[in-house]
Structures are given as C-alpha cells and as structure tokens.
C-alpha cells in the first residue's frame, strides 16, 4: 500500500513487525471456514495474512484515505468485504449470514487507543454473536480488562468485560513495533464470550448502572457510592462489608448487589 499519512484523531499506530504479526495470527488461529471481522486494518498488516486463510473477512474502516488503497489491493479476493463506517456505531449483527444460535463472528483488530473502552462496551452488546475477540490495545487497558479484585487496575472495565467474557493477556508489544511509535507499551488480549455466564444478573442494564455507580469515586466505599441504591443491611446481605471499596468486590458479588437493587426497585 502507498505511504499513508497517519491521523492522530483516529489514533493510528500501525504494526510494522512481521514477527509480531505472525504471533498475532498464530494466537487467532483462523480456520478456512470461519468468518472474521477486522476493525481498523490500517495498512493491512493483518488483513493480508487473514485473507490467505479465511472464507470471509469483513473490514471496518473509518478513514477515507485508506478505503481506496484497501479496495485496490484486496477487492479481487472474494473473501474481502469492506465497510466504510465507524466501528463505534456499526451494527455487527448485520454481518451474520443467517439466523443462528451459534456465535460465529471472530473479531480482531489493532484498536485505536483513544476509543478502545467505548468500542469494547459497544461490542459487548453483540456478545451473543461473537465466538471470540483478539485485540491490540494499550497495555494499561489490557491490564485493567484482566485485573482481579484487590488490584489497583481492577475497575468498571474489568467487571463489565469479565461479566460477559473469559479474558486472557497474551503478549506485550513495545512501541518500536509501530509506525509512528506510540508513547506507551501495547498488549494483545483474547476475549471469549461465555456460552452461559457463570453469574447472571436479572437485568443487565441495572447491573451496568450499579457497577458504574460503585466505581464513580474510586476512593470512596460501597456505602458512599451506592447511597440511594442500597443500604448497609442490603450490602451486608450480599456478604460484603459496606466499608470496602468497589475495587475489592468480585464480579459475582456485583451480580448479587445488582439483583437486590433490581428487586428492591421493583
């Protein structure tokens, strides 16, 4: 592809190390009959290797200047399907080829760091259609996604993603592997939506609302942050000390809190 002028507003940092690219493809382990979706292909570091393997690759790209080069390079390949759109607004359910009960989409991407959290929350809405996701993200974000209770990195993002997905930290990638090099380390994470969640909230919207409120002021206790949601007695009924901070509360306890809040509200 012709040299591209990287755009800061799209958070563009493109992979340039073939060894890392091969490691990512090996981690994804795509099979010929699978349906992959790539978000933000950039200069097609992953696109080419994936198209060599899979029967269908949907590409989501927002940058006008990349549409022409991508089309020119890959449009001859029947597996290549380009969507010139914003990944944050895209309806991923429209990619399904038929009504199916089996999650079929495998989503990959070197996600723009400036929109990674909102994009992950958007993708969680489509978890029932997704087999797995492999993303390059800012290392700090991957640490937050995979963090366990009691660790500083554990927060709202940890809870919301771990409620829906198994998470796995795969690989750290240094700035020197990108053009232009970012100011921070990156990492690759695997997210695999649960076929059946180990802990199920009665109402997912109430769960999301309560988790957001619990982490609204990280240095404050559950008692303070959940004022107006639950009282001390209700928090204790979930096996929790009202004086603990949200960062010490496991996902399953947030489900209990959410279910109690939902019933009390009703």
UniProtKB/Swiss-Prot annotation:
InterPro entries: KsgA/Erm (IPR001737), rRNA_Ade_diMease-like_C (IPR023165), rRNA_Ade_methylase_Trfase_N (IPR020598), rRNA_adenine_dimethylase (IPR011530), SAM-dependent_MTases_sf (IPR029063). It is an enzyme of class 2 (transferase). Its EC number is 2.1.1.182. It comes from the Bacteria. The keyword Cytoplasm applies. SUPFAM superfamilies: S-adenosyl-L-methionine-dependent methyltransferases. It is found in: Cytoplasm. It catalyses: adenosine(1518)/adenosine(1519) in 16S rRNA + 4 S-adenosyl-L-methionine = N(6)-dimethyladenosine(1518)/N(6)-dimethyladenosine(1519) in 16S rRNA + 4 S-adenosyl-L-homocysteine + 4 H(+). S-adenosyl-L-methionine binds at residues 13, 15, 40, 61, 86, 110. Keywords: Cytoplasm, Methyltransferase, RNA-binding, rRNA processing, S-adenosyl-L-methionine, Transferase. One of its GO terms (cellular component) is cytosol. NCBIfam families: ksgA (TIGR00755). This is Ribosomal RNA small subunit methyltransferase A. It comes from Hydrogenovibrio crunogenus (strain DSM 25203 / XCL-2) (Thiomicrospira crunogena).
């Amino acid at each position: 592809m012709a040299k591209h002028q990287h755009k800061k507003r799209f958070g563009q940092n493109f992979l340039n190390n073939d060894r890392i690219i091969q490691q990512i493809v090996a981690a994804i382990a795509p099979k010929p009959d699978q349906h992959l979706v790539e978000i933000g292909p950039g200069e097609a570091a992953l696109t080419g290797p994936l198209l060599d393997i899979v029967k269908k690759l949907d590409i989501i790209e927002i940058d006008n200047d990349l549409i022409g080069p991508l089309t020119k390079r890959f449009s001859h390949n029947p597996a290549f399907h380009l969507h010139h759109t914003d990944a944050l607004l895209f309806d991923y359910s429209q990619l399904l080829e038929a009504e199916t009960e089996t999650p079929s989409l495998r989503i990959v991407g070197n996600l723009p760091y400036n929109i990674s959290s909102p994009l992950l929350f958007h993708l969680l809405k489509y978890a029932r259609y997704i087999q797995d996701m492999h993303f390059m993200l800012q290392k700090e974000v991957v640490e937050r996604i995979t963090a366990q209770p009691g660790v500083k990195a554990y927060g709202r993002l940890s809870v919301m993603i771990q409620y829906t997905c198994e998470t796995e930290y795969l690989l750290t990638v240094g700035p020197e592997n990108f053009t232009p090099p970012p100011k921070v380390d990156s990492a690759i994470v695997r997210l695999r939506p649960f076929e059946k969640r180990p802990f199920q909230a009665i109402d997912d919207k109430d769960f999301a609302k309560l988790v957001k409120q619990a982490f609204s002021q990280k240095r404050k206790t559950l008692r303070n942050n959940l004022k107006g949601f639950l009282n001390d007695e209700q928090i204790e009924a979930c096996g929790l000390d009202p004086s603990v901070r949200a960062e010490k509360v496991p996902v399953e306890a947030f489900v209990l809190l959410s279910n109690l809040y939902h019933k009390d509200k009703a």
